[in-house]
Design a protein with these regions (language model features):
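N-terminal basic, low-complexity leaders that serve as flexible interaction/assembly modules and, when applicable
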Residues: 1-83, 214, 218-219
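Short glycine/proline- and acidic residue-enriched helix-loop micro-motifs
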Residues: 32-35, 96-106, 161-170
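N-terminal/domain-start segments enriched in small and hydrophobic, helix-friendly residues
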Residues: 36, 43, 82, 89-92, ...
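Short, flexible active-site-proximal loops enriched in glycine and acidic residues
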Residues: 61, 89-90, 130-132
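A short acidic, glycine/proline-enriched capping/turn motif at secondary-structure boundaries
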Residues: 68-71, 86-87, 97, 138-140
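Short, flexible, mixed-charge acidic loops at enzyme active sites
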Residues: 77-92, 144-157
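A gly/proline- and charged-residue-enriched helix-loop-helix capping module
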Residues: 84-124
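Active-site loop segments of alpha/beta catalytic cores
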Residues: 110-264
Length: 264
């Protein structure tokens, strides 16, 4: 937490973005009994794998076991994690009419399992070990919503973005509002810092980011409860770092493509 606040620290703190996973026998045993989504929606087990991973690795923070796409189900999207394919959205958004059908995420009860997992994790963790909550950033969530899953070229996303800016911004605004509520609910439940994952934003040019993404990401970050550190992370973002800083965040996450000694 001191590092997030840019205070002096005795060493560089370390945590991993996906701490709980297949390397853990306990995780494999749980997954043998249930799907990934079922695990995410079972607070006691999500808390257990969160705590076990943090203790096993000896890291300086825990990150709650969840997924960035959990928030899209309350929007009215049909989410499935298919073996070998990853996430699939069966009713993707491709038009203004589809955008109009999306629902506001205005009731935290729809994601209560995440909040319960945070509460259980916070009770079980060492008091000196911070707990990080997280969510997907607006563009990355929008790209999943429009593409219907992962993509290599984001053709559907960019088609909507370029051809119907009104629908695009309406969707991004709706997503951003839901994210503010969701992240603040995580903080109220016990998360001491939050991270925005913009995993796919590196697919955009700086001009596109500035026009179509930056205002919405900034809305989310500014809406997070004051005093809670926000980690703003993206991949393939060497051309976007200044704009990401403009969008906000106490910490800007870097990927493996960047040499730290060249940044300041």
């Amino acid at each position: 937490m001191r590092a997030c606040r840019r205070e002096a620290v005795p060493y560089t703190p370390i945590w991993l973005m996906r701490q709980a996973g297949r390397y853990m026998q306990e995780y494999r045993e749980v997954r043998a009994r249930m799907s990934f989504l079922e695990l995410c929606k079972t607070p006691s087990l999500a808390a257990e794998v969160t705590v076990t991973a943090a203790e096993r690795l000896g890291v300086d923070a825990a990150i709650i076991f969840a997924d960035i796409l959990l928030i899209i189900e309350p929007m009215g999207l049909q989410l499935e994690f298919s073996k070998g394919e990853g996430p699939v959205i069966h009713n993707p958004v491709r038009s203004a009419t589809d955008v109009d059908r999306l629902r506001e995420v205005d009731d935290e009860a729809a994601l209560s399992f995440v909040l319960d997992a945070i509460r259980e994790t916070r009770r079980a963790l060492r008091r000196d070990l911070p707990l990080i909550g997280f969510a997907g950033a607006p563009f990355t969530l929008a790209s999943y919503i429009v593409e219907g899953g992962a993509s290599k070229n984001y053709v559907h996303t960019k088609t909507l973005m370029y051809n119907d800016g009104g629908a695009w911004h309406a969707m991004m605004s709706l997503v951003a509002r839901g994210l503010v509520r969701y992240l603040n609910a995580q903080i109220e439940a016990g998360a001491q810092a939050v991270q925005l994952f913009d995993s796919w934003v590196g697919a955009l040019s700086p001009d596109d980011y500035k026009q179509y993404v930056l205002p919405h990401t900034r809305e989310v970050i500014r809406g997070v409860k004051e005093g809670t550190p926000v980690i703003h992370f993206g991949t393939g973002t060497s051309a976007l770092l200044e704009l990401m800083r403009e969008a906000g965040g106490d910490v800007i996450g870097l990927d493996w493509r960047l040499r730290l000694e060249l940044l300041h």
